[in-house]
Regions:
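Transmembrane-helix motifs of polytopic, lipid-linked glycan transferases
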Residues: 15-18, 98-119, 134, 158
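Hydrophobic/aromatic-rich transmembrane helices and adjacent perimembrane loops
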Residues: 192, 319-347
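Membrane-interface alpha helices of multi-pass inner-membrane proteins
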Residues: 157, 172-188, 194-200, 308-314
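Extracytoplasmic
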Residues: 360-506
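Loop-to-helix entry region of an early transmembrane alpha helix in multi-pass inner-membrane enzymes
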Residues: 76, 80, 88-109
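Extracytosolic helix-loop segments that constitute the early lumenal/periplasmic catalytic or substrate-binding loops
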Residues: 46-70, 77
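Perimembrane helix-loop-helix junctions
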Residues: 2-4, 193-221, 246, 279-293
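Transmembrane-helix signature of polytopic, membrane-embedded enzymes
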Residues: 111-135, 153-154, 170-171
Length: 506
């Protein structure tokens, strides 16, 4: 029967390939327009640029005296990677987005390599990669902007898959640990890769290797924590305690269920075909025969996906400020690898799967039209021109990246407001760590400085969002500054318009 269907199978593969080519071009065009858009793509996109800019000027971005203006809750690795390029070409929006783009593409290339090592067909491997690419560019998410998420995800994937690719040799386990620690200092939740691998080693490969991996990981992590805390004084206030202390304030079960629902709808055709695959094997009473289950990538992939789903449900998926990027970074790589591997085991996949997989790519890319970056520039050139005429501007986070590009001081990088949360040591933490009173003192001095500058009219211009009028000094602004009007600009990747108010000294 299969022999008689070969012409149709070949035709299905050809048609599928043509669709994949179309979606690849569509995604590349969208990504290029996103990267080259010369204005902010989101409200807080400038935050990471402030850390890079500090490094370029020989400063420690986690120096307590530079807080809260340089508050960075994510980690030091992303700014360190961008640093040499910024030193050569300037601390620009473009340079940062290009680095992000590189790691998005590197993650896609690595997933393709993993699939090929799992003997998945080239066409299905490309489909999986394009689905991941579309996920990482999805409108409304921060991954493709000036954000360390793509870098952290890349290191997490290396942490998980390198040992499998190298047959779990001790050398590969050590490399995995190093990438896991790098992932932690890029975005802390990317440390999940080490938990996935250590547990997988213990249960499916070798208890000895699992214990050795965990012990070495613990030792090197402890050494790194001591070294980082000593050399970067505000690091753990910014990157660890802030997030830990704010967990309860941003937890939302409603947000979790909304994201699960949206993620499921975006992948409905893939999930449907996974169900078909399972039914296919149940009714045919076939088993997935793995010569060595511990060494087979699909078992590791399912294990990693299960861990990711667990973390999303009980923690990160409840973040009220997140919109799918945790799902796309932590779950999608493993879901799509598993899906492509499964479809490849259905002999008739070019006929049975192609229509549904094309529909899923169509669903994922429906909102990714590159024209949005050219059609929504109104107001940005004028606002940028106004900024260029003044030196000392009390700023909205929205324009932080523009101030960095123009070499001007800034006062709110988009994360500044969260700095105070890093001082507290709650719950069991009180038994091990002291409250950091330096944070309270630094924040008090910051507010005092802002208020003094307003009263003395030291700001040449104030540009703030109406809702952020701001930082406890709204009355002083109205007393010493004159309202000049409002500008409305659009952030394409955020899919939001932002209004800013302009004030000049009386």
């Amino acid at each position: 029967m299969i022999k008689n269907l070969r012409p149709f199978l070949l035709a299905g593969q050809v048609i599928f390939t043509l669709f994949l080519l179309y979606f690849a071009v569509r995604l590349v065009c969208y990504h290029f327009a996103l990267v080259t858009f010369p204005y902010p793509n989101g409200l807080r996109e400038g935050a990471m640029m402030t850390s890079t800019n500090a490094l370029v000027h020989g400063l420690d971005p986690y120096d307590m005296s530079l807080q809260p203006q340089l508050m960075n809750p994510y980690g030091i690795v992303y700014p360190l990677i961008v640093w040499p390029f910024a030193a050569l070409f300037g601390t620009t929006i473009l340079i940062h987005r290009m680095v992000t783009a590189f790691f998005i593409l590197a993650s896609c290339a690595f997933i393709f390599y993993v699939l090929r090592r799992m003997n998945t067909s080239i066409i299905l491997s490309i489909w999986s990669v394009l689905m991941l690419y579309a996920s990482l560019l999805y409108p409304g998410t921060s991954t493709p902007t000036i954000d360390p998420g793509a870098v952290g995800m890349f290191f997490m994937l290396l942490t998980v898959f390198i040992p499998w690719l190298c047959r779990f040799s001790y050398r590969s386990l050590f490399v995995s640990i190093l990438f896991g620690i790098l992932a932690f200092y890029t975005k802390p939740y990317a440390f999940l890769g080490t938990i996935i691998l250590s547990s997988y080693l213990f249960f499916f490969v070798s208890k000895k290797k699992g214990l050795i991996y965990g012990a070495v990981l613990l030792a090197l992590s402890a050494i790194s924590v001591v070294a980082v805390a000593y050399s970067l004084p505000a690091y753990f206030d910014d990157c660890f305690f802030t997030s830990l202390n704010m967990t309860h304030s941003w937890e939302s079960m409603q947000r979790l269920y909304y994201q699960i629902n949206l993620y499921s709808r975006l992948h409905q055709w893939t999930l449907l075909m996974i169900c078909v695959f399972l039914i296919w094997h149940i009714f045919n009473r076939t088993k997935v025969r793995l010569q060595d289950p511990a060494r087979h990538g699909i078992l590791l992939t399912v294990w990693a996906g299960s861990w990711s789903a667990f973390v999303l449900y009980f923690s990160l998926g409840r973040h009220s400020g997140a919109m799918l990027w945790y799902f796309f970074q932590l779950l999608s790589p493993f879901l799509l690898v598993g899906a492509a591997w499964a479809f490849n085991r259905i002999e008739l996949w070019p006929i049975l799967c192609t229509p549904f997989l094309v529909l899923n790519l169509l669903t994922m890319t429906a909102g990714q039209d590159y024209k949005v970056f050219y059609d929504h520039r109104d107001g940005w050139p004028e606002l940028t021109m106004v900024i260029s005429k003044y030196q000392n501007i009390l700023n909205s986070p929205l324009i932080a990246s523009l101030l960095v590009e123009q070499g001007k001081p800034l006062y709110d990088n988009g994360q500044t407001e969260y700095f105070l949360s890093g001082a507290e040591r709650n719950g069991w933490m009180r038994g091990f760590f002291k409250q950091d009173d330096r944070v309270y003192l630094q924040m008090l001095m910051f507010f005092k400085d802002i208020r003094s500058k307003i009263e003395n009219k030291e700001f040449d211009l104030i540009i703030l969002q109406p809702s952020l009028l701001p930082l406890g000094v709204g009355d002083e602004i109205k007393e010493f500054y004159k309202y000049e009007g409002q500008a409305v600009v659009y952030a394409p990747q955020d899919q939001k318009p932002y209004a800013v108010t302009l004030w000049r000294p009386l």
